[in-house]
C-alpha cells in the first residue's frame, strides 16, 4: 500500500497522509505493547494486525450506531483509513466499576464500587508527568476545549461506553472501564478518534476480574517472558474474534 508523508509516530502506531486526499490519513499499527508511560515495552509479532482489526470492528459498530468517528475503512491488516483531525491531548476515561488507578487515587473506595451513570475522568496527555488528571477549569485554561465542548465530550463518551457495555454484556463480558480520545476536524467538529482496542479497556468475562482479557494482564506481569507474551497474544486474538460480531 502506498502512503504519503509521515505525519506522526507514537509508541504503538504511525500516521501517514493519504497520497491523494489530504482530508484522509492512514493509521498503521505497530507490533508494540507498552506500559508505565513507555517504561515497559515489548514486541508481539502480529499484534498490530490484531489491534487494528479490533479497533476497526469497534469503530464500525460506533459508525453504524450514529456516533461520528474518524474511521472510514480498514484496507489491510493493521491499517485503518481515517478522517484527518487534530487530536486533543486528552484521555477520556469512563468507569463503570472502581478499580486500578481510581482505587489508588481513592483508597477509601472499595474495588468494584459501581458508578451509575459511568464516571467520566480526563487526563492530560503528558508522558513525562504521567498523564495527570485534569478538570474542566484546566482544560478551558489551556485552550484545549471550551466548557460546552467538554460537556459534549462527557455526553458522547458516556454514549460510547454504554453502547459498548451493552454489546459486551450480550456476549457475557463486563466492560469495566474505557479510554477514548477525540479529534477536531477541519470544520471544528469533535469526533471519536485514535484507537479503541484491547489496550483501551478492561474486560471481565462474567464480571470476574480473574478472567480478564485485556492489557491489564501485561501490566500485572512481574517478569515478562516469551511464554507470557504468547499467552497475552492469545487473549488479544480472542477479543478480536469476539469483536468480529460487532460489525
From Swiss-Prot:
- Keywords, alphabetical: ATP-binding, Ligase, Nucleotide-binding, Purine biosynthesis
What the entry lists under HAMAP family is as follows: SAICAR_synth
Record's keyword annotation contains Nucleotidyltransferase: no
Can you tell me which family this protein belongs to?
Belongs to the SAICAR synthetase family.
Q: Which domain of life is it from?
A: Bacteria
Choose any GO biological process term that the UniProt entry carries and state it.
Answer: 'de novo' IMP biosynthetic process
Q: Looking at its record, which EC class is this enzyme?
A: ligase
Species assigned in the record: Herpetosiphon aurantiacus (strain ATCC 23779 / DSM 785 / 114-95)
Q: Which reactions does this protein catalyse?
A: 5-amino-1-(5-phospho-D-ribosyl)imidazole-4-carboxylate + L-aspartate + ATP = (2S)-2-[5-amino-1-(5-phospho-beta-D-ribosyl)imidazole-4-carboxamido]succinate + ADP + phosphate + 2 H(+)
Q: What is this protein called?
A: Phosphoribosylaminoimidazole-succinocarboxamide synthase
Q: Which gene encodes it?
A: purC
Amino acid at each position: 500500500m502506498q502512503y504519503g508523508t509521515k505525519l506522526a509516530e507514537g509508541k504503538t502506531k504511525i500516521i501517514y497522509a493519504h497520497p491523494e486526499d489530504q482530508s484522509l490519513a492512514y493509521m498503521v499499527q505497530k507490533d508494540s505493547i507498552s506500559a508505565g508511560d513507555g517504561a515497559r515495552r515489548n514486541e508481539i509479532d502480529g499484534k498490530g494486525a490484531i489491534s487494528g482489526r479490533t479497533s476497526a470492528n469497534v469503530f464500525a459498530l460506533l459508525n453504524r450506531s450514529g456516533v461520528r468517528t474518524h474511521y472510514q475503512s480498514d484496507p489491510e491488516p493493521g491499517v485503518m483509513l481515517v478522517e484527518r483531525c487534530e487530536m486533543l491531548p486528552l484521555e477520556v476515561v469512563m468507569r463503570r466499576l472502581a478499580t486500578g488507578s481510581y482505587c489508588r487515587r481513592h483508597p477509601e473506595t472499595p474495588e468494584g464500587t459501581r458508578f451509575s451513570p459511568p464516571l467520566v475522568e480526563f487526563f492530560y496527555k503528558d508522558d513525562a508527568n504521567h498523564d495527570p488528571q485534569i478538570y474542566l477549569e484546566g482544560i478551558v485554561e489551556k485552550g484545549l476545549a471550551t466548557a460546552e465542548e467538554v460537556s459534549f465530550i462527557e455526553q458522547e463518551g458516556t454514549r460510547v461506553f454504554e453502547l459498548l457495555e451493552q454489546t459486551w454484556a450480550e456476549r457475557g463480558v463486563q466492560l469495566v472501564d474505557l479510554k477514548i480520545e477525540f479529534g477536531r476536524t477541519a470544520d471544528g467538529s469533535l469526533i471519536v478518534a485514535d484507537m479503541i482496542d484491547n489496550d483501551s479497556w478492561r474486560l471481565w468475562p462474567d464480571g470476574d476480574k480473574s478472567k480478564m482479557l485485556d492489557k491489564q494482564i501485561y501490566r500485572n506481569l512481574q517478569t515478562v517472558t516469551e511464554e507470557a507474551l504468547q499467552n497475552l497474544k492469545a487473549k488479544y486474538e480472542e477479543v478480536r474474534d469476539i469483536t468480529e460480531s460487532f460489525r
